[in-house]
Amino acid sequence: MYKACFAAVALSSAIVSTGLHAETIKPVKVSKAELAGAIFNRNDAVKKDDGGHRSTDVVTFTSPDNAYQTGVYKSGPLHEDIEGPQGLPYSEFLYFLSGSVKLTSSDGSVMVVNTGEAVTLPKGWTGQFDTQGYTKLYVTYDADEAKKQ
């Protein structure tokens, strides 16, 4: 009995001490200066020029299961058709720091989202995405990514 109790205490101590020495999870902050544009000068900024469409993306957080992601994205002028049976492959929340976007859903309804406004595009949305350029904070979620883990 004594040995069993000692083993239980030793195991509990090992579990607790392991937990105490695990990496601390901390919040991820983006400063005002970064949101004003400095974030796009970071080494991890991904800059693209795809057929004249220029964009810069800085991912600020990705969950361990890859299902949830946040970041700051800057786009030049763009027209994009989001089509097909699957539509948008993930849900996305967008908050516009500058610029605007015109969203035309597949039923023809139109929504304009301006600087200081936000919109959520549900997974599966289809339509047209038109802009003269913008900078956004974004959050994406894709439950299918979590299922892959």
Regions found by a protein language model. Name each.
Residues M1-A7:
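Bacterial N-terminal signal peptides that target proteins for export
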Residues G19-Q69:
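A short, N-terminal "cap"/entry segment at the start of jelly-roll beta-barrel domains
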Residues K123-A146:
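Ligand-binding loop in jelly-roll beta-barrel domains
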Residues D107-K123:
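Short acidic-glycine-tyrosine-enriched beta hairpin
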Residues A8-I15:
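Bacterial N-terminal signal peptides
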Residues I82, L103, K136-V139:
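Short hydrophobic/aromatic-rich beta-strand segments that constitute the beta-sheet cores
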Residues Q69-L88, P122-K123:
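Conserved short histidine dyad/triad with adjacent acidic residue
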Residues L88-L103:
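Short, conserved beta-strand element in jelly-roll/cupin
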